[in-house]
Amino acid sequence: MTEQTYCDRLVQDTPFLTSLGRLSEQQVDRIILQLNRYYPQILSNKDAEKFRNPKLSLRVRLCDLLGHLQRSGERDCQEFYRALYIHAQPLHSCLPSRHALQNSDCTELDSGNASCELSDRGPVAFLTCLGLAAGLALLIYCCPPDPKVLPGARRVLGFSPVIIDRHVSRFLLAFLTDDLGGL
């Protein structure tokens, strides 16, 4: 899948950004001032005054600004997104192009029909499995060794220190020390 350019993203996000109530006048003014002050090659003083003209409606000024940036090029669109992130971060995270990018990243990683989440069972299922594993480990650890009941358990536990952290492996190795001669 090809990368989506910032200009393409701005074309996709323009209807969302210009809809009523998305950006306040103060946020638009801050974005314009940032583009004008830090990047005067993007917005000259004359352009900044035009886009901050209070006689025009906010929607018209924003449409003009976005059109100007789309015509200016990729770097200008990228700086607009940076200014939008700084001055309107909650809105930046809701942009349609960001959702499209996140969904495309997930589909590239997935086999196609699986979801992006690791598990949808929740924390109760995790705690249940953790409790079950801890209970079984405690049962094996505390029960007196009876070779007739669990003949292969000590062999399995003998290989688990390779996988488990060194702090836990000390306890497993101490458990195995009395029966290593039987391997």
Swiss-Prot record:
Keywords: Disulfide bond, Endoplasmic reticulum, Membrane, Mitochondrion, Transmembrane, Transmembrane helix
Residue ranges annotated for the CARD domain, each copy included: 8-99
Sequence intervals crossing the membrane: 122-142
GO cellular component: endoplasmic reticulum membrane; mitochondrial membrane; mitochondrion
Compartments in which it is found: Endoplasmic reticulum membrane; Mitochondrion membrane
Membrane topology label: Single-pass membrane protein
Gene3D superfamilies linked to this entry: Death Domain, Fas (1.10.533.10)
Disulfide linkage: 7-77
Main function: Plays a role in inhibiting the effects of BCL10-induced activation of NF-kappa-B. May inhibit the phosphorylation of BCL10 in a CARD-dependent manner.
Subunit structure: Associates with BCL10 by CARD-CARD interaction.
Name the UniProt record assigns to this protein: Caspase recruitment domain-containing protein 19
Lineage: Eukaryota, Metazoa, Chordata, Craniata, Vertebrata
